[in-house]
Regions:
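Hydrophobic residues in well-ordered beta-strands that form the structural core
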Residues: 17, 113-115, 192
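Short helix-capping segments at alpha-helix termini
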Residues: 32-37, 67-70, 106-107, 130-134, ...
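Asp-based, Mg2+/Mn2+-dependent phosphohydrolase catalytic module
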Residues: 1-5, 102, 118-119, 123-226
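N-terminal helical cap/lid subdomain that shapes the substrate entry/recognition surface
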Residues: 2-99
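Short, acidic loop-to-helix structural element flanking the phosphoryl-transfer center
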Residues: 84-113, 119-123, 151
């Protein structure tokens, strides 16, 4: 493995605890857009939300709703519901996440937080958790062009943070989409974590190079001393 200079860390499920909050916001959003509980259409929509965890939220809603206006309305409702949960204190850091970001910074590794949330929601989470001093960059699909599983976010992190080669990137996430994004970007290390919804088998099938119990194991995977 080449020397890692940039770590691109996913948020919900990787550094931020997700105790069903994302799916709850999805459920509320599609309910506002007419998909009532107990209907086949709602069941299909929730299944889509589950299998696309980690991807750009607007792209997920475009899969659910054929009309662009409906997709945009659902996305706005999702962001509103999730932001309300954040404001009410319904967001917590996963154990060790802040310490890992601090340790990476001490080692000269720049930290980018990556997410499928809109920038406003992303920034509200970061500020709520007090992480601004720990990171160098935060990116959403709107900042990079396309969300996961495309490579745009890690490649944008590389460019904005002055990396010299894709092999300097470490991409860490809890979903197969995170892993695919990192692999497509050519990252030097693509690591899965087991703190989200994906199983070890699913992350292995996505070809994660390393599977960690949590992001707390990242410094060791990078060869950093305690």
């Amino acid at each position: 493995m080449d020397l890692i200079t940039i770590a691109c860390l996913d948020m919900a499920g990787t550094t931020v605890a997700d105790d069903g909050g994302v799916l709850a916001a999805f459920a509320a959003a599609i309910g506002r857009c007419g998909l009532a509980e107990g209907t086949p259409a709602r069941d299909r929509a929730m299944k889509t939300a589950e299998v696309t965890m980690g991807q750009s939220k607007i792209e997920v809603f475009r899969q659910i709703f054929s009309d662009e206006a409906d997709a945009q309305r659902a996305n706005a409702a999702f962001e509103e519901c999730y932001a309300a949960a954040v404001a009410a204190g319904g967001v917590e850091a996963l154990p060790g996440a802040a310490e890992v970001m601090a340790r990476l910074g001490e080692a000269g590794i720049r930290v980018c937080l990556a997410t499928g949330f809109a920038p406003a929601t992303r920034d509200a989470i970061i500020d709520k958790l007090g992480w601004r001093p720990l990171i160098d960059l935060a990116l959403s699909p709107a900042d990079a062009g396309r969300g996961r599983p495309w490579p745009d976010i890690p490649l944008t992190a590389l460019l904005r943070l002055g990396g010299g080669a894709v092999s300097e990137l470490a991409v860490v996430g809890d979903t197969p989409s995170d892993i695919e994004s990192g692999r497509r970007a050519g990252a030097g290390l693509v690591a899965g974590v087991l703190t989200g919804r994906a199983s070890r088998e699913e992350l292995a099938e996505a070809k994660a190079a390393v599977i960690l119990d949590s992001v707390a194991g990242l410094p060791s995977a990078l060869g950093l001393s305690a």
